[in-house]
């Protein structure tokens, strides 16, 4: 144990051992570790490339506690020395924060707005700046103070320092005067003596290069040189770029091809363009803006995949696609907290592409679950990292296999063309820095250098106040991937089905007897609006209700599926069951703007135990229901005959669909028997076959065996229920349900005309028919009003959305103005006292100045008076008497000079050099000497 001199050495001595937590330095008594200045050079050697050192300086500007919007990288010539400068418009630093930044291992970065800081070790600036050059000056301002800090190996070598010394000088940002601290004067002297600025004014002039009232500027000189004495960075080849020196020579020496080297390895402009996964700031390299890009959105033939590590609960998105620039640049781009760590990492078939496997494919992944290395150029080689690389290899191989099988090309780099335009085009607004997705495929090279939101062709995203377009989450990607796999399986299953010939009824359907038809009165049917005319009814279910119930259609009553055709008797039962299990029940849409839609009747297929033993020819086809639209005259009393609708006939099914322009009219439902005949079938067969029960059979007619008459179910109960519904709800449950009674009554009237042998009163039926007509007309009016109200509601909703967007815009502008006003306050509240003191001092100085002004005025008056007197005396001197006076004064002056010489010789200590001989001072001195020596007595 090493102790300070004078510290107790015994083990039991008081004060020995480790210090207590919170104790001061006086309680330690143990030597502190020191850091040699040579550590600055050894620490910088962790960066194998100069661009990674530059990335460290850019990371400090991107971190959420700085939030710089613009970074300028430039090369300047100061005193014949090339200097590399980095300037940002961030928050700046106080002298205390600057001291922590120039120290080692101190970091207090926080998470803001779900943005994680990139730096975690507190070492990036030291290692990055010393990797680029030997000396660095930091200029920072935060709205109140200007601070200069020096980190220089040259200075430490000249003063032969034993530790790392960082001179820091603060200045007042208002008057640019140095703030006196205990080390400000020696720090300023050290900076002026050992930096490239030897005057204080030159030092302060560097703050003018920082845009705005806050920001930081880093100036690095003595740029690192190679062994041949040439600068490591090439500033001369490209005036708008910074290149790595002699990269062509290195490639030729290794035997490689120059084009195969990624541009990001030797061009700083290309490196800055992909440094961040989603850039949030503008970078100007040598006074020209860098075209930053989201590399995941700059690929063609993009496919998304997910990776769920076993050591974390979060899924990670992986993006695969083909490069649109150079197919020889391929691999995995691995990011961490939005920052590029490894670029073009070869995995899977890309490691040894014997026949061009994986060439041109780029993968993008953000590995926040991995730990980056100390220099942020690689990840720590752990088990998690190896598992991630293996998973990436498998997924890349699967992507390559899928794309090669789709495109049907040979695995050769020559056979596959390079896509020129990515699948999506994203561009960053130059003002709000938000990313906007442009509709269609647009070549990014055709866009202007400065793009703004109001250039967007999409009207929704033409303002900077509108948030960015939301991307798919990892959960959505998983669902879409699973859905895609299911669609692939379904397509494979449907391929043999499409080759089969769909069968139709070969024999005419049979008519049920009266007794068998009466057994169908216990069945119900529902209707639902169908948007597409190609949608066919495919199934239904039985209802245990004894009569027709006018209710809102329940999802359990019938099921639709637009993906399947009817498969009839000869098809295997297992296939029919599989199709029925895959059917989905669409929900009713009561918010449709049009009140009337096509309505087709779904047919129920109840499957019995022996249903597969009967062929389709043994089944009967009951009356089917379909919409009949009125003509232009709207003659509701005339019922038109329609053709028989067979569910298996494609041409008849298409013929039942009327033109689109008649969709806004009320349909009348007409019941038709499929085929009138006297053939009877077994009742058990009817239960097994498809059926739809819409109308009932009169009891008297059923018992007598007369021809069938169709009447609606429960007419009285239906009328009472409609009256009750209209009393509290003007909108009907369903258009089809409102049309059923009218159509059924029409069928009843026609049935009565055909069966003249019965004595049913026609007058009562006619009254009921007229009443139902009036009810239908009333429902039509109510529906028309409902549509009008819906249109007004939509207009009000659009107006509300418009004013809401305007309110958000004004609110955003208010926030901007309040922020600018807050920034305009040059001094914070803690400086108010200092400002008040300065005001009092200036006020006192003003009072003193006023007093001096008054005194000067009085002296001016006295001088003017004396001048007038002299002018008068001059006039009197011109007379003869004046000439005598002048001669007398001259004699008196000579006499006084002689007396002064005499007094000087007698009294050597007298100083008579500055005495005026025109005044009476010499006379007074002579009188004093004579009186002191008692000569006058």
Swiss-Prot record:
Alphabetized InterPro entries for the sequence: HATPase_C_sf, MORC_ATPase, Morc_S5, Znf_CW
Sequence segments annotated as region (Disordered): 606-637
Subcellular location: Nucleus
Tissues expressed in: Expressed at low levels in normal tissues, with highest expression levels in placenta and testis. Expression is significantly increased in subset of diffuse large B-cell lymphomas.
GO MF annotations, alphabetized: ATP hydrolysis activity; histone H3K4me3 reader activity; methylated histone binding; zinc ion binding
Note on domains (UniProt): The CW-TYPE zinc finger mediates its binding to trimethylated histone H3K4me3.
General function of this protein: Histone methylation reader which binds to non-methylated (H3K4me0), monomethylated (H3K4me1), dimethylated (H3K4me2) and trimethylated (H3K4me3) 'Lys-4' on histone H3. The order of binding preference is H3K4me3 > H3K4me2 > H3K4me1 > H3K4me0.
Protein name (database record): MORC family CW-type zinc finger protein 4
Organism: Homo sapiens
Name of the coding gene: MORC4
